[in-house]
Amino acid sequence: NRSDIPKPQSLPHDFHDYPSLAELMATASLTAPPEGVRSTGRLQRLVAPSLRQRHLMLPTAAMTLDPLHSTGIAHALAGVDRILNILMLTQSGTEQRQAVQQYETSFLQESKLLDELVSTAYLVMNDFERFTAACMIYFAGAIRCEERYQQGQNPTHLWNADDREFVQFSKQACFALR
């Protein structure tokens, strides 16, 4: 507890609206950074995951998305599985090129769907009913994808992003919720 580090004038959240949190934070001291609390704009980024035929990035290296729905672990593990399948293919150039293209297509479509769902949830966060509806769309896709795996299917996309009807429904629902 260093006394030379100034307490921030304001924290990222207005704890005055939450008396129990304000009470908990009343005795808190800043540990880092010494300059105080900082804020920034969106930290999201997206790049194509294929650098070369045998140089692929995991989804979590190619995309940074807000952790609202905790998608990172699932996306990373699916990426490991997909990349291993690509590496296990024989050295056939055509077969590998097709698999790499499928990897990139799946990744980009999943990322687009996730961005739509997460951004919609944030836009309507102040309206609990709309926020709940936005989150339900994400979980409907996640659960359906898990069910497909349990049924022995091997979806090419996570979050049901390979189901055109679901993706179209998601777009329409997000548009209506916004």
Positions of PLM-derived features:
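Tryptophan-centric aromatic hotspots in well-structured domains and transmembrane helices
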Residues: 1, 43, 55, 69, ...
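Conserved FAD/dinucleotide-binding core of flavoprotein oxidoreductases
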Residues: 1-39, 71-74, 92-93
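FAD-binding beta-loop-beta segment adjacent to the flavin cofactor pocket
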Residues: 36-58, 63-64
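Conserved active-site and cofactor/substrate-binding residues in soluble primary-metabolism enzymes
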Residues: 56, 75-78, 98
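Long, K/E/R/D-enriched contiguous segments that form extended
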Residues: 61, 68, 92-95
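A conserved FAD-binding loop/helix module that cradles the flavin
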Residues: 65-84
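Active-site-proximal substrate-binding core of FAD-dependent oxidoreductases
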Residues: 82-138, 149
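C-terminal auxiliary extensions adjacent to catalytic cores
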Residues: 125-178
